[in-house]
């Protein structure tokens, strides 16, 4: 094994440690490690695979490790994470033989600990190599088995089964273990999709047109952020489900639009690209996040976005009543629809978090509603699949605001491939539906008096 690969595995342990101890986001930590250590494409891929894979399958790995680790409570966390990443490679990856994985783990243990730790790591992994892991069929309770087999907390599996049934829950849990495609949105102000596909192919990337969203391209090989076309502002990294929001909002030409929870700016810039003389007022609570919106707008060559640092629950203090043609509330949420991109989410969220978020979502909708013109459209969206944050928040909004009604034209504004998922004025996309992020969109019209 080369030194650089050894370092990759040590970095994976570092990331897992920070995720567990500091509640850090794995995706941000990974990007930081990759940049800091100037990893090659191969090592970048290996670090991402080991880190995400171990987090995604943490509960399964712990189930496998339990019979072999005598004193889990007194095992140092970095040692246990080293065992996790090693077992992940032994069970789920086949390019490196077990003896090499064990050797590498022991070397890391020697470097970071003492002889007793390296002996323990060697003993645990060699015992697993000889005996194999216990079968998941030993778990008799079906819900518990599904939870451990797919590494989703049992409370969450039970909640989804109650909301959607066993089959849909099982499908969702299974797909959450897979890696998502990188998808980009073409900046049609600058270039056509066909032309961008040609340029990216010439740069050596493997790409294909999305069959779901007309301005989307899927990346099959490479990272398009490193392309010249990205630097030139020809595209934005954005999931296909997220792109549906701008279609749902349907802002065109000279519309005045409020994006009340705008950072990091993917939907903001998408809306702005579809306008001519109109403008997007983009709000976010944090200054550093508003700077991200400005940075994206500048890269894309968009001058019709005005940014504000503010709490959108106080938005009535900043804007006049009935001043916007379109309002988007892409609300803060539990993020349960994007577990493939942020696998640590499933271990950090709780039932109480969902209750608190639903309350914030309600406040955001209530604050923005008076700012919409009569006949205008309000779109509420989240990247979660939980009914308490989605359908229930949307239904309750209508009950509190008799001056609003369901927007039954939502379906016809969306791309044909997703129209069948619309019910009334709501769209719920599950990760397994289109191999995209889980997403919810609902649309309301303000009645004309």
Predicted regions and their residues:
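S-adenosylmethionine
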Residues: 1-449
């Amino acid at each position: 094994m080369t030194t650089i690969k050894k370092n990759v595995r040590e970095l994976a342990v570092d990331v897992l440690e920070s995720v567990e101890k500091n509640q850090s986001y794995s995706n941000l930590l990974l990007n930081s490690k990759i940049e800091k250590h100037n990893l090659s494409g191969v090592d970048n891929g290996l670090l991402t695979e080991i880190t995400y894979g171990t987090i995604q399958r943490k509960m399964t790995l712990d189930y496998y490790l339990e019979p072999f680790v005598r004193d889990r409570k007194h095992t140092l966390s970095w040692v246990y994470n080293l065992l996790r990443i090693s077992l992940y490679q032994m069970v789920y990856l086949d390019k490196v033989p077990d003896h090499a994985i064990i050797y590498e783990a022991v070397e890391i243990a020697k470097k970071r600990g003492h002889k007793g730790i390296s002996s323990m790591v060697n003993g645990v992994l060699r015992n697993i190599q000889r005996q194999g892991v216990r079968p998941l069929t030993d778990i008799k309770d079906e819900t518990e088995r599904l939870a451990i087999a797919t590494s989703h907390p049992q409370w969450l599996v039970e909640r989804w089964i109650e909301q959607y049934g066993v089959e849909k829950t099982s499908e969702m849990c299974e797909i959450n273990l897979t890696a998502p495609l990188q998808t980009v949105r073409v900046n049609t102000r600058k270039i056509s999709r066909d032309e961008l596909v040609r340029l990216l192919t010439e740069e050596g990337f493997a790409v294909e047109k999305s069959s779901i969203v007309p301005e989307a391209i899927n990346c099959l090989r490479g990272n398009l952020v490193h392309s010249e076309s990205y630097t030139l502002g020809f595209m934005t990294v954005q999931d296909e489900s997220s792109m549906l929001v701008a279609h749902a909002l349907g802002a065109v030409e000279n519309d005045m639009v409020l994006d009340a929870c705008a950072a990091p700016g993917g939907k903001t810039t998408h809306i702005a690209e579809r306008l001519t003389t109109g403008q997007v007022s983009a709000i976010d609570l944090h200054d550093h996040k508003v700077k991200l919106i400005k940075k994206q707008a500048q890269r894309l060559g968009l001058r019709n976005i005005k940014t504000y640092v503010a709490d959108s629950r106080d938005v009535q203090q900043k804007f006049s009543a009935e001043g916007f043609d379109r309002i988007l509330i892409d609300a803060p949420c539990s993020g349960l629809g994007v577990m493939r991109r942020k696998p640590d989410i499933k271990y950090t969220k709780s039932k109480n978090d969902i209750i608190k978020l639903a309350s914030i979502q309600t406040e955001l909708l209530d604050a923005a509603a008076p700012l919409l013109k009569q006949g205008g459209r309000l779109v509420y969206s989240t990247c979660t699949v939980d009914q308490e944050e989605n359908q229930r928040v949307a239904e309750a909004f209508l009950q509190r605001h008799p001056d609003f009604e369901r927007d039954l034209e939502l379906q016809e504004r969306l791309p044909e491939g997703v129209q069948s998922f619309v019910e009334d004025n709501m769209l719920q996309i599950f990760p397994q539906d289109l191999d995209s992020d889980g997403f919810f969109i609902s649309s309301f019209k303000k009645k004309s008096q």
